[in-house]
């Protein structure tokens, strides 16, 4: 009887050693996700991993390493990876979460994982490694420059006042003879009585307050351009707060965004800002010409740039001639000490 038991154990060991163990890694599947693809600098991001054994045999020895995106910081750890030693029964999973932060604006490619499985006796091991697909975009920080905040606050306040004064976007600019085609509600009975014939109101459909956020990337140092992105975010958050629709224009790799507002609109723009390599591809003069071509009523302009040159200020003066309101210019000045 004991002999049969020993023979059975030896046979089981041989099967595990030479049949099951070499194939174990093929039956381990990793599923993973991040709780966000767009984050603030320093925001806590959670990675969730699920390692699943889809085989009818147990996997008795697993070393499992998960590397977070390069530059990630895991609170309380010096390393940016998690290590686990475990075994998995048939059709069971190992699930866990890792929280980490990313320090600054940019695109962070997802990390990688490494799986090591071994034989029953510890003589051999097999290693599988692969990249974790996807990326996380970190948006710019909010601008904390007091002079910028003060100028911006005053200008946004002026827009709010104008909206209050002209709350109804339909204004009556005169009166015309009734032709029979106008709706009855447009007839002005008061002016009809004065004229002795039917008169209708002639209305001007004005446009509600709207804005263009214009980013100049044709000039400036890297630090000035980084600060310009921070100013763009700050301006757009203030416009969102006031429910003012805004268009975004740039002459760089950030690209453009059609007029709108709301979370989806804001997230699209923040993703563009986060992914920027700070390249400019057209002149400031070309950017201003586009603003002039696409001008519309009740439009406010926010020009964000590194300190403007004389030529750039001349281009800005051309836009001012077409604008109903004073243009808000926010220049990203960087102290040399901060740049160093």
Model features per residue range: what roles?
Residues 169, 260-267:
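Low-complexity, intrinsically disordered regions enriched in charged/polar residues
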Residues 12-258:
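An amphipathic, basic-hydrophobic helix/alpha-beta surface used to engage anionic
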Residues 1-29, 46, 263-264, 270-340:
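Von Willebrand factor type A / integrin I
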């Amino acid at each position: 009887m004991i002999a049969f038991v020993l023979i059975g154990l030896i046979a089981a060991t041989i099967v595990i050693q030479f049949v099951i163990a070499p194939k174990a890694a093929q039956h381990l599947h990793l599923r993973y996700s991040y709780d966000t693809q767009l984050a603030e600098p320093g925001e806590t991001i959670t990675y969730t991993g699920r390692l699943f054994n889809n085989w009818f045999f147990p996997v008795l020895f697993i070393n499992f390493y998960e590397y977070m995106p390069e530059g990630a910081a895991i609170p309380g750890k010096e390393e940016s990876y998690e290590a686990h030693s475990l075994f998995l029964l048939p059709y069971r999973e190992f699930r866990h979460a890792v929280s980490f932060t990313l320090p600054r604006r940019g695109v962070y490619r997802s990390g990688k994982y490494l799986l090591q499985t071994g034989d029953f006796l510890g003589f051999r091991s097999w290693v599988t490694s692969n990249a974790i697909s996807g990326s996380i975009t970190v948006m710019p920080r909010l601008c904390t420059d007091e002079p910028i905040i003060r100028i911006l606050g005053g200008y946004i306040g002026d827009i709010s006042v104008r909206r209050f004064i002209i709350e109804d976007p339909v204004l009556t600019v005169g009166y015309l003879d009734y032709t029979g085609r106008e709706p009855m509600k447009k007839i002005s009975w008061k002016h009809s009585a004065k004229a002795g014939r039917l008169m209708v109101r002639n209305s001007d459909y004005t446009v509600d307050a709207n804005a263009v956020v214009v980013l100049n990337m044709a000039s400036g140092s890297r630090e000035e351009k980084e600060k310009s992105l921070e100013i763009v975010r700050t301006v757009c958050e203030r416009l969102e707060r006031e429910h003012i629709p805004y268009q975004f224009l740039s002459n760089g790799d950030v690209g453009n965004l059609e007029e709108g507002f709301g979370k989806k609109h804001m997230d699209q723009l923040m993703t563009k800002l986060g992914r920027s390599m700070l390249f400019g591809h057209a002149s400031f003069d070309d950017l201003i010409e586009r603003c002039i071509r696409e001008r519309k009523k009740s439009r406010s302009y926010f020009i964000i740039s590194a300190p403007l040159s004389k030529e750039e200020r001349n281009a800005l003066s051309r836009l001012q001639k077409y604008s109903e309101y004073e243009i808000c210019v926010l220049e990203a000045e960087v102290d040399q000490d901060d740049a160093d």
